[in-house]
């Protein structure tokens, strides 16, 4: 082949350098499938600016965005799960724990902290769905109880953000025991008059929804969160019927009276502060309009 033929036989694309786009710069919305700039999405608290879909958010990031800057202090950060049953399904439970810890950088699926919200003392907790589906095992139960006890000690509100597939099957009855354990400590809080607010996020299912997640003095949900005991596919397979549109979503539950309110993530911080100031008889951190009677 002559030199001139070699030049013209080259593909136009072979001389074009591909753009080197670092991984993680762009994120596709799981609802509308719009491609979003990741930094913009992070600034928007992982809510799609195009369609308003609330994506899942890292538990630690959620709590740090909620609390006043530099006010957070972690509770029971040293607790780690143990494979006391030597459980094995397709993989050893011990290996699943190690993989989840490596992937998330967390020791288990619940993060608990003290801090302030608009200068009001508060105890907070959040489930990390990325850690084994946010499942509740012995450590999750223990950390929840320690957080509740801290709230009673400080006489301040406790707010928990749930995102879980339910009890952790690899811990068998030890995980189911956490349902009673967490419910019992909330009963103690109620006796002492310490407020507990439960915020249900997508998804909140199984043993978590059947215990502490639905036991708030006020039960709040994020928009379109999936909330229930069994998931919709399991229910459809059991009853052999098509479920109503939006069944088990937060809007459906609000309509049926199962939850108290739906709050957008961007409004969560201000809403919680306003509600907690009323529950604790403290001045509101915001200037609220005076109520005017109809006959005035």
UniProtKB/Swiss-Prot annotation:
Q: Which Pfam families does the entry link to?
A: Carboxyl_trans, Zn_ribbon_ACC
Q: What is catalysed by this protein?
A: N(6)-carboxybiotinyl-L-lysyl-[protein] + acetyl-CoA = N(6)-biotinyl-L-lysyl-[protein] + malonyl-CoA
What is the enzyme's main class? Answer: transferase
**Biochemical pathway:** Lipid metabolism; malonyl-CoA biosynthesis; malonyl-CoA from acetyl-CoA: step 1/1
Q: Which GO terms describe its molecular function?
A: acetyl-CoA carboxylase activity; ATP binding; carboxyl- or carbamoyltransferase activity; zinc ion binding
- Cofactor(s) the protein needs: Zn(2+)
Where does the UniProt annotation locate this protein?
Cytoplasm
Annotated positions binding Zn(2+): 29, 32, 48, 51
In the record's cofactor note, how is the cofactor described as bound? Answer: Binds 1 zinc ion per subunit.
EC number(s) from the headed UniProt entry = 2.1.3.15
Q: Which UniProt keywords apply?
A: ATP-binding, Cytoplasm, Fatty acid biosynthesis, Fatty acid metabolism, Lipid biosynthesis, Lipid metabolism, Metal-binding, Nucleotide-binding, Transferase, Zinc, Zinc-finger
Q: What does this protein do?
A: Component of the acetyl coenzyme A carboxylase (ACC) complex. Biotin carboxylase (BC) catalyzes the carboxylation of biotin on its carrier protein (BCCP) and then the CO(2) group is transferred by the transcarboxylase to acetyl-CoA to form malonyl-CoA.
Protein's recorded name: Acetyl-coenzyme A carboxylase carboxyl transferase subunit beta
Species this chain originates from? Haemophilus influenzae (strain ATCC 51907 / DSM 11121 / KW20 / Rd)
């Amino acid at each position: 082949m002559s030199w001139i033929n070699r030049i013209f036989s080259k593909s136009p694309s072979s001389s074009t350098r591909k753009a080197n786009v670092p991984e993680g710069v762009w994120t596709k919305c799981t609802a509308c499938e719009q491609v979003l700039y990741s930094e913009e999405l992070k600034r928007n608290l992982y809510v799609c600016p195009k369609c308003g879909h609330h994506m899942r958010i890292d538990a630690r990031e959620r709590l740090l965005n909620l609390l006043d800057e530099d006010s957070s202090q972690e509770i029971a950060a040293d607790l780690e799960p143990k494979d006391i049953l030597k459980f094995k399904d397709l993989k050893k439970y011990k290996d699943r724990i190690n993989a989840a810890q490596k992937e998330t950088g967390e020791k288990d699926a619940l993060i608990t902290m003290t801090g302030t919200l608009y200068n009001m003392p508060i105890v907070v907790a959040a489930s990390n769905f990325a850690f084994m589906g946010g499942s509740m095992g012995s450590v999750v139960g223990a950390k929840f109880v320690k957080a509740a006890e801290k709230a009673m000690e400080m006489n301040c509100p406790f707010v928990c953000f749930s995102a879980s597939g339910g009890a952790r099957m690899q811990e068998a009855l030890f995980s189911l025991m956490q349902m009673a354990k967490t419910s019992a400590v909330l009963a103690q809080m109620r006796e002492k008059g310490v407020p507990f607010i439960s915020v249900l996020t997508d998804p909140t299912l199984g043993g978590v929804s059947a215990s502490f997640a639905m036991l708030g003095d006020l039960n709040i949900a994020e928009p379109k969160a999936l909330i229930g005991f069994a998931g919709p596919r399991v229910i459809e397979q059991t009853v052999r019927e098509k479920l109503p549109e939006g069944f088990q979503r937060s809007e459906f539950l609000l309509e049926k009276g199962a939850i108290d309110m739906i709050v957008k993530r961007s409004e969560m911080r201000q809403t919680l502060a306003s509600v907690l100031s009323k529950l604790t008889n403290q001045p509101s951190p915001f200037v609220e309009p005076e109520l005017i009677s109809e006959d005035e």
